[in-house]
Amino acid sequence: MTQSLHPAAQKGFSSGAELYQQVRPNYPQEIGVWLQDRLQIDENSTVIDLGSGTGKFLPYLLQTQAKIVAIEPVTEMLQQLQQAHPMVISLQAFSDQLPLDDESIDAIVCAQSFHWFANLKTLKEMHRVLAPSGHLGLVWNQRDIDVDWVKALANEIAPFEGDTPRYHTGQWKQVFEHQGLFKFNGLQNFQLYHHGTVEQVVSKRLLSTSFIAAMSQHEQQRLKAKFEQIVFDFTGLNPQDQIDFPYRTFAYHFQKIST
């Protein structure tokens, strides 16, 4: 979500915003404690939800009673957010051009988004708007590939990734290697299960992946059938049967270094 959006984000999230809102998992309840204890967010805080998407992470921020500013560059995603959370301040902007004053923000949270804008220009902009010793939280839900059928699904998807930025590659970490803007304060991880039908929480969820959502409808339907066949082969479950899709949630805590 830099000034030039990656084509997979622009096309996939524009055309797939409604599906994204419907089928993406929420987050574990422990994340609320993490926000308050680690990022020190409370009712006196002002917080940015950066790359907010359709607002899936907003309920956890709202529980802290902080003042929230949701920032999202993709119009269709922002529209879904505004429908779901009309009372939240929301802005259409890029991660490296935040329309906010210097040192005006106590914490920035990027949930399921930082890999899209992991560049030094964004880090500098975050550093600018954060108050002294302000907090940065990066959160991702990741499919638990220690489970055999989840690993098989991941293997099916992998050839289509191309150069699409992804959390699991770890490339997003490179921006933190040679910078004096943020210090790393720790990583916590949690377990999460997304319960629903195979069609809803597995195959349609996978169709909401950026580079898949950018494909033709014909190709998406072919993949949907393939995903459902993989689940059946491993579990014996049909598309309308109930299933728990296992995730691991990773929460990284950084803190601003005052220069």
Task: List each model region and its residues.
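A short acidic, Gly/Pro-enriched loop at the edge of an enzyme's catalytic core
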Residues: 96-107
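A short, conserved alpha-helix within the catalytic core of class I
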Residues: 117-125
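Conserved catalytic/acceptor-binding region of the Class I
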Residues: 127-196
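Conserved Class I S-adenosyl-L-methionine
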Residues: 170, 174-259
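Conserved class I S-adenosyl-L-methionine
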Residues: 1-42, 56
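A short beta-strand submotif of the Rossmann-like class I SAM-dependent methyltransferase core
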Residues: 110-111, 119
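Nucleotide donor/acceptor-binding cores
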Residues: 44-45, 103
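Class I SAM-dependent methyltransferase SAM/SAH-binding core
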Residues: 48, 54-97
